[in-house]
Amino acid sequence: LGFGGGLLALSLWRRGFPVRAAHRVIAKRYAFLALMGAVHMVLLFWGDIMFFYGVAGIVIAFLLRKRDSTLLLIAYILFALCALGGVVAFISGALDPLGVVATEGIGTIESYPNLLLSQLVTLGSQVLATPIILLMYLPVMLAGFVWARQGVLADVPSHRPTLLRWVALAVVITVVIGALWSLSTLGVIAQRWANAANNANSFLGVFTGPGILAGLALVLQPIQERLSAGAPLPAVLWPFAALGKRSMSGYVGQSILFFCLVHPFTLNFGHDLGAFGQAALAFAVWLVTLIFACVLEAFDRRGPFE
C-alpha cells in the first residue's frame, strides 16, 4: 500500500497537482481506507489491517515534500525500534515457562450481536494503540513509498543488491520464527518457544513484507522485461493479475467467506480440522476469490470494493 501511495503521488505530480492538493487527494483516499477498515473490523474480522494502513497513509500524505533520504531515515529508525521490540518480546516469551499462545477464545462467540460488541471494543482498543501500532506499519509503507518514487521495481537490475538484502532478511525471519513456533507446537521443544516466536513475530513480521515484494520482483524480472517490450501477459499469470487488480475485494471477500464458514452462529465449520485441513480450507477460500476475480476480469469489471 505504501508502494501504491508512491505511484499515486507520482501520478498527481505528472498531472501538475500542487503539493497541497496532492496532500488532500492522498489523505482523503487513505482516510476512506481507514474508514473501510474500521467497518470491516467491527462487522466481519477483528484482525483487519486496512485501518492502520489508512492511518499510516494519511501520515505519509503530509510527508510528500520530504526527500527520499529523509523518508528512508525515518523508516529505518522505526524498523530499528521494531527490531528492538521484537528482541525484547522474544526474550520475555522465552523466559516465561508457562507462556502459551492464547488462541482458545478465537471463533467461540455464540451470537452475532456479541461478536459485534467484542469487535467494537477491539476497534476502540486499536484506536488507542494506534501510535504504537504505527511503529510497525509506517516504516513498511514508507519503504514502499520511496521504492515507488525511485522506480525500484521498474528497474530491478539497478536495485538488485537492495532487493536481495531484503529477501535474505525475510528468509531468516521466516525460517527462525517458523521453525521455533512449529517445533514448539509439535512438542519437540518447550511450549514457551512458541510464545516467544509469537511475541517476536508481532514486531519482526513486518520486515518480511518488503522481502516478499523484493523476491517477487526478482523472480518476475524476465517476464516484466518481456512485457515492457510489448509481449502479452503469460496465461499462467493472468489469474493472479486479475486478483491483484482487485486485492481489496479479495481481502474483504475472504473475510465474508470465513465469516459464513467458521463462526458458531453460522456454519461452525473447520474447528476440528488439523493444520493441514485448515490450510486446505484457507486455500479453498482464496481460490474462490481468485475465480471471482477472473470472472470480473473477463467482463472487464472492477471489484466491488475497488
Placement of each model-derived feature along the sequence:
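Membrane helical hairpin/interfacial module
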Residues: 1-50
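Hydrophobic alpha-helical membrane segments of integral membrane proteins
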Residues: 42-59, 70-76
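Alpha-helical transmembrane segments of multi-pass integral membrane proteins
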Residues: 189-301
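Long hydrophobic alpha-helical segments that form multi-pass transmembrane helix bundles
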Residues: 77-149
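Juxtamembrane/transmembrane-helix boundary motifs at the membrane-water interface
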Residues: 18-19, 35, 88-102, 114, ...
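Kinked, hydrophobic transmembrane alpha-helices enriched for aromatic residues
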Residues: 1-5, 32-44, 173-181, 242-269
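Solvent-exposed interhelical
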Residues: 59-77, 146-169
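Specific transmembrane alpha-helix
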Residues: 2-7, 49-64, 132-155, 204-225
